[in-house]
Amino acid sequence: MIITQEKNKQVVQSHDFDQVNCTIDAEDMRYVASLLRNNYSKPILAVIREITANALDANLEAGSKKRAIVKVPSSFSPVFSVRDFGGGISKEDVFGLYSKYGKSTKRDSNIYIGAFGIGKFAPLSYGDNFTCTSYHNGYKTAYNIFVDENDDTKIVRLHEPELSNEPTGLCIGVAVAN
């Protein structure tokens, strides 16, 4: 989704005042990330909506005709999961792109639902962690995305990449409370 911004804004000042661009220091990012994680009034619906929308976008981006697989929790498997058939994500992109709040690859087209780069973290509005399993270039790699004791969002790779015959894509899993 293309995010439109006013491009012809003209700011006129009566004097050449001292000024500075406002930024966020790395050590303060945890507070902003916490606000972004907790901005949903209905976290359960947000998880379903955001993860499903990302799966639809991933399939579209990859040209996949397969439907995303949505699994609802049960007493035998108390996990909500969505499996897409997009391109999957390399370790470099998980650590360099997926890990960044506000980073999105979908801002150049209106065919995608997402664009703000925060929906991927929606599961953290419901619980303190979720899993992301990537099927990419013939390998399967699982990651745990969690909020640590300092309220920082972290991603840890759970194992070395394993050979896989599974189709490319991502599977996001969110454990649910009883």
Q: Model regions: which residues?
A:
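Short acidic loop-to-helix transition motifs that present clustered carboxylates
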Residues: 28, 75, 116
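Conserved structural-core and active-site-/substrate-pathway-adjacent residues in large, well-folded domains
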Residues: 51-54, 70, 123, 172
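Conserved beta-strand-loop-beta-strand hairpin that lines the nucleotide-binding pocket
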Residues: 56-109, 150-156
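GHKL-type ATPase core
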Residues: 110-178
